[in-house]
Amino acid sequence: MKSNYAVIVAAGKGKRMKMPINKQFICIQGKPILYYSISVFSKNPLVDKIVLVCAEDEIEYCKQEIVKKYNFDKVVKIVSGGKERQHSVFNALKVLENCSVVLIHDGARPFVTDRIIEDGIKYSNMYGACACGVVPKDTIKIKGKEGFSYKTLVRKELFIVQTPQCFDYNLIYDCHKKLANNKVQVTDDTTVAEYFGNMVYLYEGSYDNIKITTPEDLIIAENIFKTHKYI
């Protein structure tokens, strides 16, 4: 029987955080950000296995201080990241065995919910590729080279894509394999799928499902924890 996998990507250096440790290991309410990101997938009955991606020099730390310390039994492998995010994801995809649906998630997004995970699996089975996200709250403009606005986009047609981004395994593996032979750089996995002509279904995420990237995000995250009791 095939399994649903979560691939949690935690290999980034997080330079914008301007802290001596990687952002995934910063503690909120006494636990690392990465703990919360893994925990939701670990507890969800529809997720069978988890593969964690981290920097090569942090594999042992993740194994001891995250996986073993918090008894994340669903984490079956820890693989090293690559030069760019797309290489890190492909490294993980290559080790998945007998996979049906794969959910690719940022390690620095601790507020993913069961509903988002379960919808991702459902829509992956229906459409082959999907991603959660939200409609922007602000008006979005395109800025010209000289600094002036030259176009205002229709807000209701825009979508801020989050993670998890969820796929039929064979579809996204084949796309990443083809991409590895090109010199195209992408910032997320929906772009990988779209690059090779696949449609990606977009479904409702959450405004709480933020990626913690800057010191300001840490303040927002602390408030989300206190308000919604994610602990």
Curated annotation (Swiss-Prot):
Enzyme's top EC category: transferase
EC number: 2.7.7.60
Site (Positions MEP for the nucleophilic attack): R155, K211
A biological process from GO: isopentenyl diphosphate biosynthetic process, methylerythritol 4-phosphate pathway
Entry keyword Transferase: yes
Keyword Ribosomal protein: no
UniProt-recorded Gene Ontology molecular function terms: 2-C-methyl-D-erythritol 4-phosphate cytidylyltransferase activity
Pfam families per UniProt: IspD (PF01128)
Family (UniProt): Belongs to the IspD/TarI cytidylyltransferase family. IspD subfamily.
HAMAP family hit by this protein: IspD (MF_00108)
Summary of the function given for this chain in its UniProt record: Catalyzes the formation of 4-diphosphocytidyl-2-C-methyl-D-erythritol from CTP and 2-C-methyl-D-erythritol 4-phosphate (MEP).
Protein name per UniProt: 2-C-methyl-D-erythritol 4-phosphate cytidylyltransferase
Species per Swiss-Prot/TrEMBL record: Clostridium kluyveri (strain ATCC 8527 / DSM 555 / NBRC 12016 / NCIMB 10680 / K1)
Name of the encoding gene: ispD
